[in-house]
Amino acid sequence: MAILERLAEMQNATGKNRVVMVLDGMGVAVMKKLLDTDGFFYRHLTDTETAIIPATTVAATTAYRTGKMPWETGFIGWSQYFSETDEVIEIFLNRNLYTGELSKMLQHTNTLPSKTIVETMNDKGLRAFEVMPAFAPGGFDTFDAWLDRIVELCNTETDAYIYAYWPEPDSAMHDNGINNPIPKNLLREMEQKIENAIGQIHNKTEFLITADHGHKEIEHLFIEDYPDIAKCLMHPLSLESRCVSLFIKPEYVQKFPELFNKHFGKWFKLVTKTEFETTYLHAEQPIRFIGDFVALATDKYDLKQRSDTIILKSHHAGITPDELEIPIIKINRLIDCNFII
C-alpha cells in the first residue's frame, strides 16, 4: 500500500508538473542484472517498495490508475474465473484463457470498475493526463512517440499530473528471459532516451519512475501431469501461473493441502482463501475470484493447467524478492536551475 501513498503524494502536490512513469517489469532485481550501477536510473534511485500483490500488471496498474487496491476493483490477476459464463477470462483481453474465444462477460472485463485518478482530477478542474501505449485510446505505437508526448505536456503545462505507462521491458523478458541481450539492450536504450527526454523539459517537473512488479526466470509444471491433483479441481487454474487460484471440489477440500504439498510444497506456499484475502490482499470482504486455496510461488516454477498454453521464459506474480521489490527513482527537473537534481 505504500506505493499508492507515494503516488497520492504526487497527485496532491502543486506548483509543478508531476510525472509517474511506470516501466512494466523493471523491478530492482532486473535493474541489477541489466543496468550499470552508475547509470541514470541508479543515480536517482532513492528507495524501494514492495509491489502490490499479486505482483502483476492487471492488479498493480489498475491500482496505480484508480488509487484502489485489487480487492476493491476486482482486477486481481491476468485471468479470473467467472461463474456467470463458467469461464476463466483474461481480464484485459476479454478472452477465454483456455479456448482463445472472446467472452460474453463484458460487464467486468475491458472496463475499469471506477474512474481513474486522472478522470477524477479532470472532473475537479485540475490538469491531469494519461500517456499510454497503442492498446489504449489515444495511445502511442512507439516508445519515442510516447516520450515525445510526455515532454510536450511537461513543456506546455506547469501544474499537471501525468501518469505514463509503457509495457517494456516486461514483454521482452517474457519472450527471451532476463539474462538475454534483447531485454538488456532494450532497457539500456530506454534509460538513455528517458534521460535525454527529461533534459528537454523546461518547466519545473518532478518524476517518479517505478514498476508494477519485478521478474524471475522460470521453469514449468503442468497439472495434466498430476492426475491426483487434476481430479480435485472444480474449475481450471486461474489468476496467475505463479499466484494460482484453486477451486476445489467439496469432497477433496480437507485432504487437498496434504496432496498439493506432497507434489509442490518445495516450490509453492499453499494458503487458504481467507488467508490470501486478509494477509496478502488486505481485503475487507471475500472476493469471488479467489478459490478455496491459492498457491504462491516461492521458487523458480510456475504452475499451469496444460503444456499447450503459452509458455513464458520469465514471469512474475510470485512472492520472491525478485518479483516484489520495485524501485523508487526520483528526478526533479527545475526551471530555475536548468539541470536535473
Can you say where each PLM-predicted feature lies in the sequence?
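Feature captures the catalytic ectodomains and active-site-proximal regions of enzymes
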Residues: 1-341
